[in-house]
From Swiss-Prot:
This is Large ribosomal subunit protein bL33c. The gene is rpl33. It comes from the Eukaryota. It is found in: Plastid, Chloroplast. Belongs to the bacterial ribosomal protein bL33 family. The lineage of its organism: Eukaryota, Viridiplantae, Streptophyta, Embryophyta, Tracheophyta. GO terms for cellular component: chloroplast; ribonucleoprotein complex; ribosome. GO terms for molecular function: structural constituent of ribosome. GO terms for biological process: translation. InterPro entries: Ribosomal_bL33 (IPR001705), Ribosomal_bL33_CS (IPR018264), Ribosomal_bL33_sf (IPR038584), Ribosomal_zn-bd (IPR011332). Keywords: Chloroplast, Plastid, Ribonucleoprotein, Ribosomal protein.
């Protein structure tokens, strides 16, 4: 059995370009992805390059609070 807090947690990644400038987009919305991270290996905020379907290009997606 697991003791204490879980090591792997679920995090939500949100497009940083969509949240900054919502004027230059072709369609409305904010791209979000759900993934997991290991709390011991990555204690800081997670940032990954993912495809944003609203900006139509690969952008940096950062971890947000739940």
């Amino acid at each position: 059995m697991a003791k204490g807090k879980d090591i792997r947690i679920r995090v939500i990644l949100e497009c940083t370009t969509c949240t900054r400038n919502s004027v230059n987009k072709k369609s409305t919305g904010i791209s979000r992805y759900i993934t997991q991270k290991n709390r011991h290996n990555t204690p800081s905020r997670l940032e990954l390059r993912k495809f944003c379907r609203y900006c139509y290009k690969h952008t940096i997606h950062g971890e947000i609070k739940k």
